[in-house]
């Protein structure tokens, strides 16, 4: 069990607007990049291959292919440096860590997509 004083201090630094996503989801992370005195937002889009827990130390790893080369980036979940995390599609995977995607190429490296239920026409017209 962690010390209550440490938990109280850490709670101040946790983000309240964290997007819910899981391993296998396709996400777009809008990350603030500081270049000199200017600050701009850079988007990084890929598949979440790992999530770690740990209050303010929680991280997630996103993998994408850029010009045929695999690029992975680790993001702190509670960092003030990102603007938002967009979930583009939900992935249907049976594992917590998808490191096996590193060895796969082409169509084999795809993750099955969960189809989100669309509202029926009757329900849409009734409201």
UniProtKB/Swiss-Prot annotation:
Alphabetic keyword roster: Ribonucleoprotein, Ribosomal protein
The keyword Ribosomal protein appears for this protein: yes
Superkingdom of source: Bacteria
GO CC annotation: cytosolic large ribosomal subunit
Gene Ontology MF terms: structural constituent of ribosome
PROSITE patterns: RIBOSOMAL_L19
Protein's GO biological process: translation
Disulfide bonds: none
Regions crossing the membrane: none
SUPFAM superfamilies xrefs: Translation proteins SH3-like domain (SSF50104)
HAMAP family: Ribosomal_bL19
UniProt function note: This protein is located at the 30S-50S ribosomal subunit interface and may play a role in the structure and function of the aminoacyl-tRNA binding site.
Similarity-based family: Belongs to the bacterial ribosomal protein bL19 family.
Full protein name: Large ribosomal subunit protein bL19
Organism annotation: Myxococcus xanthus (strain DK1622)
Lineage: Bacteria, Pseudomonadati, Myxococcota, Myxococcia, Myxococcales
């Amino acid at each position: 069990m962690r010390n209550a004083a440490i938990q109280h201090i850490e709670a101040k630094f946790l983000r309240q607007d964290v997007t819910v996503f899981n391993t296998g989801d396709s996400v777009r992370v809008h990350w603030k990049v500081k270049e000199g005195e200017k600050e701009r937002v850079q988007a990084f889009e890929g598949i979440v291959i790992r999530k770690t827990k740990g209050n303010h130390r929680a991280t997630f790893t996103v993998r994408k292919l850029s010009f045929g080369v695999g690029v992975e980036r680790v993001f702190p979940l509670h960092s003030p440096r990102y603007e938002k995390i967009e979930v583009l599609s939900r992935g249907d995977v049976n594992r917590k860590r998808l490191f096996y995607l590193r060895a796969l190429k082409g169509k084999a490296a795809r993750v099955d997509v969960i189809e989100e239920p669309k509202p029926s026409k009757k329900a849409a017209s009734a409201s």
